[in-house]
């Protein structure tokens, strides 16, 4: 392992960690993240060592500008400057004596986003990408909005914790003697990214910047997408491989926002071997290892379980779009006007979090009972692959109304398992087309397909701005039917870890009801302390969101604390945030303190107001 810096054209330098194979020169694969490669994500090291030792790839890990041990300021996620930086990094890597000049790019979540973004920039040496659990559309399918509706519980998670994380110092041993000056620059000049996101409630040019959709033609290199049906970025699967005009490969499993080799739910597979085979094909002119380009796991009917370890089902392989796909339209009878209940949705998972502490879906009967529902008997196995749509004429009287649609599998014993869901911020009246999240599912004979419609999907997204009703007329459900062919070959995957990486110890995911005051509250939290290559680290996350079911007033509270202990410094960044929405605005207060041991280094206070869409 080698640590180095790449000097940018503007004089800033980016920290890079290199894992080099014994046989050189070799192709290089790049991952670039803001999550501090040398401490907070240093535990990911075994994967990079495997790429080098077992598969002969050089691996480069980079802290993006202003994060970890890289210079500059992290003014926002997915900055235009970040793409310029990484274009320079790719050129630097390609010019090294140990590199063949062929570069691939990969990454989970943030690293998947910028893999897509760099492919759109078309740097000369970038030959293939593998985005994992990422989205092609920053507005419709990220931690910020879902169908235009503000994500709510995510606001106390990533949307907040990046503020204190960005105020932590570079690793002194890596940066050198001026590390404290660089730390103080971060502390003095950074502002929370959340404020920028809240300032853009509509789908405007801000969100198109960094999104692949709708201009997929910008990508002209081979792209392998890894997606998970229990992850929040599952829509970047079928639709994306169908739209990119370059060789594509889809690997979609039952996984949450964790590595396919260790995720719950499984089955778990060795994704590193699959990625290496894909890079072999396009960085080394190797042979194609899959007979068909796309492989996904079709989940079969099963009981709901928030800590499910393994999903029943089968792997499918096919081209996409597939000749075995068709649409089936089902007319849903009109039902009486529905009075919106703001805390419907608690039995479902929290979409973008996708893993503990938020868990997987529980029994949906709790939410079904507070929704409009239609049940359709399933007399023989019924399989779908793709996105379900609900079209209807909707009249809503709530301020800032939404429509939330859930598709469920109801077993003979009455238990209701979530298959997919979709949420859309809507106008007071008009035609709507709600696209549910992509999935692959098979209902067993004797079960029922249930459609549930409500005016809230809380706490996944913010509830409407006040009480009201929802009326649907002329609703039609469109199912993406898939007829499986058992004779089609599927890859022989190497099994992943026998045990998942999810650990419920120390995890909080609680639902509370104040019966007298009619307030529902969801509480989340987790904490950990661990060794790092240069010291120790501690992370603590505590948050809750609430809704008054009479007035629809909603609150969010988040308390996040990071501590990094190096021989030179014990740095702590502690942030407390409160958000209130009770109508047309989000009122945000945030206070951050930064300490060196017991000594206060800086203190920031913000109070901002942002419009609701």
Predicted region positions:
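Cap/lid segment of the alpha/beta-hydrolase catalytic domain
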Residues: 24-94, 143-144, 399, 411, ...
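C-terminal, loop-rich substrate-recognition/catalytic regions characterized by aromatic stacking residues
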Residues: 251, 259-260, 264-595, 599-613
